[in-house]
Amino acid sequence: MPIYDEASVPGTAAGRSTTDVGATAGANPFNIPADEEIFRFREEERARKEQDKLIAQTMRVADKTTFAAQMQATATADARTLLRELRPPKGPKATTTLAASSVGTLDRRKEKENMADFIAKKREIFLLQMSLDTKRAEIKKLEERARQREEALKKSEQMLEEDALRFDAFLKENDEKVQEAIKKAEAEAKAKQDKVLEIKRLNTATAALRSELNKYEEQLEDCRRYKEFLDSITPPEWFEQQAAKLQRRKDALVAEWQSQCEALKQRREAALAAKTAAESDYANARTQQQAERAERAIKESVAALKEIMKEKEPQPPNLDFEMDPEDEEMYFQEPGQLLAVYKQLEESNLFYIQNAQETEEALEELRQKLRDTKTRMDAEAQGLQGQVSTLQASIVAAREKAKRLKDRTLENEGAFTLSMGSSNAPTSSVTGSSGPGGPVNLKELGDKVREVYVRCGFDADASISTLQMLTNIEMKLEEYLNLAEGMTPDYVDGAEKAREKDRRKVARDEKLSTQHREHEARMARALERAAAPVFKKTGKPLMFRSAPPQRKKVVQADDRNDEEAELEAYLAQDMI
């Protein structure tokens, strides 16, 4: 049996207040109130306690009581309430209270009973009644659950029966579909076989047509060759006559088109003149009848002008056509013409054959002369080659001699320059100076000038001197500068952008090629490292002991000037 707390059960002495007992005296204590009533009782109890607390805070000390006195007063109030309930009703009507239910027990001998025992018995009765109600509710729930289970089982059985019926229907439908699919597959197979036979028949027909087409193409090619042959032997005057005939036809088409355009133009001008005349008559009309006639004439002329304006101008003739092959006439109308041409060609061919034989004999004689001349020229070339070798040796010796003389001249000019005390002498244009004490070779300077001369667009000529090349380069530069001054800024900007674009493209290509080469080099090094054997150190590693002594180099400052350094260099060269 479950045990409940008296304070948590509404309707008991410990869980009710004095005012609640008086208000619910006629209610059945064995009925469990609803949940909202329990919560309402709790809220009322909480509000009552808050109110009592506020009242206690405002009361005087003399009016306040202890907790024991409050409990005694509550117990006395509850006992009085129970006594009022146990008294019999005074009126003739019976009530549904607990006192009315215990009327039969009032005639028995009353024994004195303690209030606590009475409340305990009431509590036990209430708890028993609550336990019975709980069990009845559980039994009712179990019965309801069993009923729901039975209904669910019935529904499941019904669903299983329906599923079985549907499955049977599905099997039947599936069998029908299988039969239909088999019939359809047989029909498709038959149709496929028919299509295959049709394809074979069409392939056979296509092959026959293709062979016939090839035969016609061969015939057409033969006809084209015959036509080309006939055109080749046809006199040119015939083609000129055909071209003149075609031109006359084109001229006739152009003349017809021009006449149509002229007729349309005349009709428009006539309609416009009629409209102008009608307007003039309407403006000069003096009577109503004349005005009406002029107005009708204006309407008619306007309508006629609209009709004429709606007419489209004739399209110009298409002159881009050739003679129709069906209308084109052939020069050869009789076989005798071809026989005459063949005879003439045969005679000319015999003449050409005779000329070819004579030409071949002359060619053989020329070949023999060529062989003899070649043998003689080879012998002469060998002799000239020996002379060339001798001349080259002489040229080399002369160049060496000229070089020695040039070096001696440079030494003399250097001595003269030092005696004058000037580092930038006028002879520097001849000797050149790439820096302090560094003479430039005249040959290198001439080669540089010649390279610039060739890059400027001139032809390389060994007979031109360096000064002439420089003069030509200067003239070329002046010409280009004059051309650049005459150019528009837009053209110059466009050319600069194009050159800059080309330069960037070349730089980009070079960069990509460099990156590609570096990538290939890295890949090669990686492959070498991967293929190289693993180096394993053996033994004890070397330890750093002490660094070897280092000697400090003292740099002596050179206080000499450029002239002294050049003099020493010249003297050293002279001594050498």
Swiss-Prot record:
Q: Which UniProt keywords apply?
A: Cell projection, Cilium, Coiled coil, Cytoplasm, Cytoskeleton, Flagellum
Gene Ontology cellular component? axonemal doublet microtubule; motile cilium
Compartments, as annotated in UniProt: Cytoplasm, Cytoskeleton, Flagellum axoneme
Q: Which residues form a coiled coil?
A: 125-226, 254-311, 342-408
A GO MF annotation of the entry reads: dynein complex binding
Q: Which domain of life is it from?
A: Eukaryota
Subunit relationships: Interacts with FAP73; form the modifier of inner arm (MIA) complex.
Which PANTHER family does this one have? CILIA AND FLAGELLA ASSOCIATED PROTEIN 100 (PTHR21683:SF3), COILED-COIL DOMAIN-CONTAINING PROTEIN 42 LIKE-2-LIKE-RELATED (PTHR21683)
Q: What does this protein do?
A: As part of MIA, a complex associated with the outer doublet microtubules of the axoneme, may play a role in ciliary/flagellar motility by regulating the assembly and the activity of axonemal inner dynein arm.
Name of this chain's protein: Cilia- and flagella-associated protein 100
